[in-house]
Amino acid sequence: MGKAQIIQHQARRILSQSNRNCLFRRSYETLPAANQTLPSRIKTDINQKASIIPLLEQWRKQGYEVNPSHLRGLIKNLSDCKNFTTALEASKWMFKHSVFDNFPEDCAAQLHLVNTVLGLEEAEKMFKNIPEKMRDYSVLLSSYTKPVRTVDKAEATFKKMRELGFLLKPYLFNSMICLYGQLQRLDMVEKLLYKLKKNNMEVGSLKVNNVSRVYANINAMEKFKTWVSKEGIELERDTIVAMAKAYHRAGSIEKAR
């Protein structure tokens, strides 16, 4: 099993943990009644988008050990609720105090939060400080493929991932396909789709957002349609509808049907 597969497997294992259990476990046998309400106070502070760091510090100083799965679950749930700032606070606290051994996916989760809250420049700074064996390039690639202005960095990151043997999932190719679609780079879209097929990866249905932008003109669309048919790639219904509309706008009524 390659490094990227190990990371992804570990991420799924950790993030599958339920957040319905207790967030912390007591290192002693008894729990003082005065502390029984602390979990509810944490929940209240989260709902009010207040900093939870003082409560985490208090809980830890009173002799409670952090449950890794549940703290990770807390961070994930905060992110799912788009409470990214509080999630980043909890993630940084987790790293600062080394409350348990961190995994590459912990770094990836924090990198995503840094990019979301503080921006791409800060995310790049953080990435440079992550030990090589703990780096997850997929987060960085995703960040680079969103703004067109970072195409050079996206291509460099994609190349690095290929050299390291990390390009094991179709979604990594899809990120670049989407980027090249925005740039009207039909040649690169075809090249990446060919690599997916060559590597025996499941292409599946192509999302309309990933390919519709390459239809700069009817000739390009005809070429793409022929190539897709030859390779046996299934187009999503929305993509077929988008192509039909493009034919209709160009006056090719028969082809639009």
From Swiss-Prot:
PANTHER family named in the record: OS12G0527900 PROTEIN, PENTACOTRIPEPTIDE-REPEAT REGION OF PRORP DOMAIN-CONTAINING PROTEIN
One Pfam family this sequence matches: PPR
Keyword rRNA processing applies: no
Keywords noted in UniProt: Repeat
PPR repeats: 133-168, 169-203
Molecular function as annotated in GO: mRNA binding
Record protein name field: Putative pentatricopeptide repeat-containing protein At1g43010
Coiled-coil zones: none
Family: Belongs to the PPR family. P subfamily.
InterPro entries: Pentatricopeptide_rpt (IPR002885), TPR-like_helical_dom_sf (IPR011990)
